[in-house]
Amino acid sequence: MLIFGPPGAGKSDLLLRLLGRGHDLVADDRVELTDGVACASEPLRGLIEVRGWGIVQRAYLPAVRAVLAVHLVPADTPISRMPEENARCPLTDLPLLRLHGLHVSAPERVDIALDCLTGRALLLPQGCMPGDDG
């Protein structure tokens, strides 16, 4: 996935929490995206900023096909409960998930979106609740 947003939106924080859940690092900053494949810029490969600790080098994947764009927005920015159906990132044309990056459930929301995109879960069409008659 590609995580983007303004400074202070929680990109590195969310990345750290996703790494703790078993996700792999491609890049913490300056991602190069070519034909849907993301890779780190040469001088930053394997580096991640751990605020309050410093720059850490760790194992990383050299490249991966991106399947989801995660747009982190400031905490005071409202996010619709039910976003536009089939929302796409205008920069990448990837499916788009908007999040508050520092929200406690952000990693779970990313995992659920990835599960839906990879067939491990089913995203129901909006307005379609099982058991509803109308």
Regions found by a protein language model. Give the residues of each.
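Hydrophobic alpha-helical segments, principally membrane-spanning helices and signal/leader peptides
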Residues: S12-L14, G36-V37, P83
